[in-house]
C-alpha cells in the first residue's frame, strides 16, 4: 500500500500521511537495538542510476537491517561503528565480500571479530572469471565454433542441476569442443564443494588442492582466481568456524526493489532509510 493509498483511506493529505508514518517509523525503528547482536552481514545494494548504491548492515540471526546509508565502502559505515561502541555489542563474526573497502573497516573497528569472506560473492567472482575466459575463447575461435561458444554463457554459468531438455547436450558439445572452457567449468563446479567440507582442516586441504589444479591448467583466468583465493584464504576458511554468509541480504535486496517500486516518496532520504530499517516487519506486494 502506497502513501497515496493510506491518505485516501484515512481522508488525510499525502503530506500529513507521510509525516505521521515517518514519525511512527522514527520512534519504533530509528535506532535499532544493537546490544546482543553477534553476527553481521555487510553488503551494498544498487538502486539505479539516480540513487546508486546503499551500504546495508544486517543482523544475520534475526534478519534486521541495522544500518543503511547512501554510498559504498568505508565512509558509508562510519556512523555504524560509533553506535556499536555505545551499545557495547560483542560481535563474533562479520560476513562480507573480498572488497578491501569493507573488510579493512571491519579489521579496524572490530579487531576481535572474525572476518568471513562470503561464499556467494566468491562463487559470483568465479562465474565472472569463467565468463571472461569464454569471451577470450570467442575472440580466438573461427567459423561455427565461434558461434557455438558465444551462445554458451547462460549454460556455463548456470547450476547444471537446473538445466533442462536440450540445454545439457548443448553444454556438453560446447565443452567437448573447447578444452580451456571444459577445465574452467569443472573448476567452477568443484569450487562449490569447498563449503561442504566438515572441518577447517578439510576445507584448507580442499582449497589448496583446488588452487593447485587451477594453476596446473595454465589458463590465465583460472590462475587469477587461484591467486585471489590464496590471498584471501584466512577469511574464506573462517567459514568452518562461523558458517555465515550474506545470503539473507539477497532476499532483502528483492524486498527493497519492491519497496522502491511502490513509490513511497523516497526523494526524502531519511524516510527511505526508516522504511529500510522497518523492512523485517513489513510485507510489500506489487498490485497490477
What do these predicted ranges mean?
Residues 13, 24-28, 98, 133, ...:
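The DNA-recognition helices of helix-turn-helix-type DNA-binding domains
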Residues 130-147:
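Conserved phosphate-handling catalytic cores of large alpha/beta enzymes
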Residues 39, 115-116:
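Conserved beta-strand scaffold positions in the cores of enzyme catalytic domains, especially
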